Amino acid sequence: MGSNSSKISDLPKNEYLKRLSGPEAISENDPFWNQLFSFSFSAPTSSTELKLLEEATISVCKSLVENNPRTGNLAALTKVFLARTRELRLSAECQNHIFIWQTHNALFIICCLLKVFICEMSEEELQLHFTYEEKLPGTYTLCVLLGSDSEDLLEELLCSLIQLITDTPLLDITYEISVEAISAMIVFLSCQLFHKEVLRQSISHKYLMQGPCLPYTSKLVKTLLYNFIRQEKPPPPGTHVFPQQSDGGGLLYGLASGVATGLWTVFTLGGVGSKAASPELTSPLANQSLLLLLVLVNLTDAPDIPNPYRQAVTSFKNTQDSSPFPSSVPHTFQINFNSLYTTLCEQQTSDQATLLLYTLLHQNANVRTYMLARTDMENLVLPILEILYHVEERNSHHVYMALIILLILTEDDGFNRSIHEVILKNITWYSERVLTEISLGSLLILVVIRTIQYNMTRTRDKYLHTNCLAALANMSAQFRSLHQYAAQRIISLFSLLSKKHNKVLEQATQSLRGSLSSSDVPLPDYAQDLSVIEEVIRMMLEIINSCLTNSLHHNPNLVYALLYKRDLFEQFRTHPSFQDIMQNIDLVISFFSSRLLQSGAELSVERVLEIIKQGVVALPKDRLKKFPELKFKYVEEEQPEEFFIPYVWSLVYNSAVGLYWNPQDIQLFAMDSD
């Protein structure tokens, strides 16, 4: 490659890489390793740059695959790295920049090679490559794994990465190696990307769920969570770990000099400080930590061993909680819930933060109880509502997660009451109407109804409808002081459903007539469409009825909207599917219509509301028929991993810092999906 070369495409010609991947065995104490690890460059950031690096690595790997059975150089490289990691903590404490820099570079090389190996070969073949040792010329064998002196180098490497993540103090000089270790663990598990089916057993599963890695479970999960919570930014370029060149030059690359004699010269590709990072990537460490955490939590259970990382995530407690952990709960730890809550509120623009929030609310009772007791729930709910409001800009999975979070929250009556007590001013992102003052509860209703209407006209996803309506139903008995616009939108949605019902009914009638005259043409299933729309209408009527039955006196604006559009409900009074639920609505409409009639014509809005408020007191409550309380609970579908594992890996594919996979190699999810 030479000291002046700066192109990634030159990497396969580089003398050090050629020697590593060539036919000559390199012993672990050869000075070559220091030379190999003494490079510096601005890390590739764009997909184009990362693709070039990947292609260059593939070329090196082909040679290594061919020669490694004779040389054992992959094992030697790994052992040199492992020896260095044992001294890493001391080096950090002693501010040994050069040692940390070289160890980072060793890990970077291993990670690049590992990524290509995992894509190109089976796990068994990969494991085999880590067992080859240096042999006499003309012969090659592998270590006998079952022998008394055998070692599983791949497992040792994974354990070393976990220890590096959990035990290395986070300093400016260790930031990059911490990120690289997390990236390497993601790469280690990336074999899932190259399988259409969800992997239920693999070598990496075995390593992580039993053996020497297992005791680090809670420590690893806690570290990854705190990395996410702290959102540590990378050190400024001036405090980079790469050492400045001394007068003698030697093997070290000087950042300012533009001269290098190590493996790679500076890649003039940009990097830290070259361009403004997107908001999600202001902390590569936090981003990468969260992605790894989600991957670990969503690993499938082993046949006889539940996923320990999921156990850790579902059972951790607040640092202020002094109660003992149940003895039956493994992998326990404590974390600062206030800090966790604050970061979750701030980071909801990303899919992965929303997925973490969902996971914690759904599976960790301690977190759920804590969050529902907060007096500032608007900080959490508003970002979720904003995701739903901009539904057309979000992928469907992100929208689902946001909706399910709302559904889980609305299972709690205390939440449903408190959101109507929180008054918000000037919601700038809500553009359909100026909302100078509105309760959080009314805003939630507006956004959920808007999501339903969007779904009706665009995606027509029944699953989306069901979750939206379930959240509204859970809230309905606790509706309080609904904003007039929220009340109008409830009735407007019913109006839209009514028109859709009439249209489908007309189409079904015409279709039936057509079928009588011609039996050859296949007809659309309007009966199915009608059944679905009637189910949704029934749900809306139950929501309105629930509010009228339980909190009529708190909601004059809903009664006003009901009276204003009373004709809408006429056609459903005698409909067999809605007769029972229409009784109370019909009674309320009749009662208040009569009182308005008695008060004369040309009444102002203020006067009508006054009559409604007076009438509420006079309405005989015993005449309202009681219905079972509307309560819906979110339950994960069977085999949730079929949804979550492809989703998590799509987030890794799209959001991981500095990791690139060829889209043509991806089997787990469709590349054209959102």
From Swiss-Prot:
The family database entries (InterPro entries) matched by this protein are listed as: Dymeclin
What subcellular compartments does it reside in? Cytoplasm; Golgi apparatus; Membrane
Name the job this protein performs.
Answer: Necessary for correct organization of Golgi apparatus. Involved in bone development.
How is the protein disposed in the membrane? Lipid-anchor
Self-association and partners:
Interacts with GOLM1 and PPIB.
Alphabetically ordered keywords of this record: Cytoplasm, Golgi apparatus, Lipoprotein, Membrane, Myristate
The primary site where this protein sits is cytoplasm
Its family remark reads: Belongs to the dymeclin family.
> What does the record say about PTM?
Myristoylated in vitro; myristoylation is not essential for protein targeting to Golgi compartment.
What is the protein's given name?
Dymeclin
One Gene Ontology term of the molecular function aspect? enzyme binding
Q: One GO cellular component from the entry?
A: cytoplasm
Pfam annotation, one family: Dymeclin
Lipid-modified residues of type N-myristoyl glycine are G2
GO BP terms: namely: bone development; Golgi organization
Gene name of this polypeptide: Dym
